[in-house]
Amino acid sequence: NEFIQVILNIINNAKDALIQNISDNEDRLIIIKLYQKQNNLVISIKDNAHGVNEKIIDKIFQPYFTTKHKSKGTGIGLFMSNEIITKHMKGKLIVKNSNFTYNKNNYYGAEFIIYLPIKI
């Protein structure tokens, strides 16, 4: 299903960023939260891999844009994820960098937020 592919794309990107940016002896976190906000189901997926460079954050949903080595990334995963959420599911997908606290420790990383309209 397309929605599962979106979630897997985001989680796999977070995993890759964690492996690249966080040493083996540090916490590697991917936190997923689901909640309702107004008439939307909101799904937040965040990691502690130090965030997306602010110089490129506005480009990551563009087709063929990748920061990975050519053998690892095609640059279409996040583009297709955005297309699925916005065009097929009539939702919204955003990315931002965020600070958060988990188990009394402070972290910084990328946060992908999916808004999906729901009927009440």
Residue ranges and their predicted role:
Residues 89-103:
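Glycine-rich ATP-binding loops of the HATPase_c
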Residues 13-18:
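Short helix-loop "hinge" at the ATP-lid/N-box region of the Bergerat-fold HATPase_c
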Residues 80-90:
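Conserved glycine-/histidine-rich ATP-lid loop and adjacent helix of the Bergerat-fold HATPase_c
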Residues 47:
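Acidic ATP/Mg2+-coordinating residue in the GHKL
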Residues 52-64:
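Short conserved segment of the HATPase_c
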Residues 25-39:
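Short beta-strand/loop element within the Bergerat-fold HATPase_c
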Residues 3-4:
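A residue-level detector for a conserved hydrophobic packing site
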